[in-house]
Swiss-Prot record:
Family listed: Belongs to the SHMT family.
Protein name: Serine hydroxymethyltransferase
Taxonomic lineage of the native organism: Bacteria, Pseudomonadati, Pseudomonadota, Gammaproteobacteria, Pasteurellales
Domain of life: Bacteria
Organism per entry: Haemophilus influenzae (strain PittGG)
Main location group: cytoplasm
Length: 421
């Protein structure tokens, strides 16, 4: 039997301690991983709702279980809000993740063994864009395009590869690209070879929702995104389209359910509905504008301190810092910054001489720090502290600099908490 006053703290103190420790870690560390963000208490409330108990196989108005009348309301709310937010004609809110959303798109549009053309993981793409270790590179014949030495997509290279391999589907989108993708150009290439254009906008969905980054929906046959990252919602996936082809919409529906998934996570869909409502608020655009401003401000500090920034800047929420010139590794930088309570991730950079698990760079993103209230002056100061740590790597004063930086980090985290009381 359950009672509403039951707590994890009373029942499972080991798990409770891990939860408390993670809460403290998030409050006392500066989060700069570009794919992470802080969900609002409202989003987390929805995730912890009684909808976690409900099975709802099927779609609103056409379920395989009874008792879904309120699940229907929740899912339709999420669908309608996502349509309004992105200007989409078709939306599926059921994918459990971005990767599962992508798998559903492949399953709807192409067959096993068909050729896909996507961005190389080592050049800023994603595992599901054709990497050989992913289902997308195992089930399909994947051909990869990359970026130039300047860190920009080489559209002529994309076109030439498309003409050579005649893909059934071209994937546009990224996990580590700091410039604006020309969606219209990618569609032009896709049309030239008779391919579908599939855009994974997971990293920039929040910026697109705010009107600060080009919307791919007018150009792509299908678009996917995660609902966390810049959007700032729960961990989950989303499929959208405005291509006007009802047959594609039907294929997408059946590719999600029953082909790839069974019952949807209604509590997560409820949290998505909250996230979309938050993204429709006027202040959301201001938040996303500050995300970009903060990224640009940090870039300038790194450049002033002698560090190379891939593509020489950023037009979104992230940027890559290359340490090839300094002879440092991303792995060492990641570890040293982590000791100072600054969380980043090591990342491959153009012409990287290091192995993928070592790398010669880091990826830095500003959605999380911006959400906790960091302004341009704060992030300039933060970037300076990061450069102090990087400058000291391998030197006698390394540990001292890390310790001093950690104290500064703790002070600013106390001033700007993630979840103020």
């Amino acid at each position: 039997m359950f009672t509403r006053n039951m707590t994890i703290a009373d029942y499972d103190p080991v798990l409770w301690q891990a939860i408390q420790d993670e809460n403290r870690r998030q409050e006392e560390h500066i989060e700069l991983i570009a794919s992470e963000n802080y969900a609002s208490p409202r989003v987390m409330e929805a995730q912890g709702s009684q909808f976690t108990n409900k099975y709802a196989e099927g779609y609103p108005g056409k379920r395989y279980y009874g008792g879904c009348e309120y699940a229907d309301i929740v899912e339709q709310l999420a669908i309608d809000r996502a349509k309004e937010l992105f200007g989409a004609d078709y939306v599926n809110v059921q994918p459990h993740s971005g990767s599962q959303a992508n798998a559903a798109v492949y399953g709807a549009l192409i067959n096993a063994g068909d050729t896909i053309l996507g961005m190389d993981l080592a050049h800023g793409g994603h595992l599901t864009h054709g990497a050989k270790v992913s289902f997308s590179g195992k089930i399909y014949n994947s051909v990869l395009y990359g970026i130039t030495a300047d860190g920009l997509i080489d559209y002529e290279d994309v076109r030439q590869k498309a003409l050579e391999c005649k893909p059934k589907l071209i994937v546009a989108g990224f996990s580590a690209y700091s410039q604006v993708v020309d969606w219209a150009k990618m569609r032009e290439i896709a049309d030239e070879v008779g391919a579908y254009l599939f855009v994974d906008m997971a990293h920039v969905a929040g910026l697109i929702a705010a009107g600060l980054y080009p919307n791919p929906l007018p150009h792509a046959h299908v678009v996917t995104t995660t609902t966390h990252k810049t959007l700032g919602g729960p961990r989950g996936g989303l499929i959208l389209s405005s291509c006007g082809d009802e047959e594609i919409y039907k294929k997408l529906q059946s590719s999600v359910f029953p082909a790839n998934q069974g019952g949807p996570l209604v509590h997560i869909i409820a949290a998505k509905a909250v996230c979309f409502k938050e993204a429709l608020e006027p202040q959301y655009k201001e938040y996303q504008a500050n995300v970009i401003k903060n990224a640009k401000a940090m870039v300038e500090v790194f450049k002033q301190r002698g560090y190379d920034v891939v593509s020489n800047g950023t037009e979104n929420h992230l940027f890559l810092v290359s340490f090839i010139k300094q002879g440092l590794t991303g792995k060492a930088a990641d570890a040293a910054l982590g000791k100072a309570n600054i969380t980043v991730n090591k990342n491959a950079v153009p012409n990287d001489p290091q192995k993928p698990f070592v790398t010669s760079g880091i990826r830095v993103g500003t959605p999380s720090v911006t959400r906790r209230g960091f302004n341009e002056n704060d992030v300039r100061e933060l970037a300076g502290w990061m450069c102090d740590v990087l400058d000291a790597l391998g030197k006698e004063n390394e540990e001292q600099v890390i310790a001093e930086t950690k104290e500064k980090v703790l002070a600013i985290c106390k001033r700007l908490p993630v979840y103020p009381k």
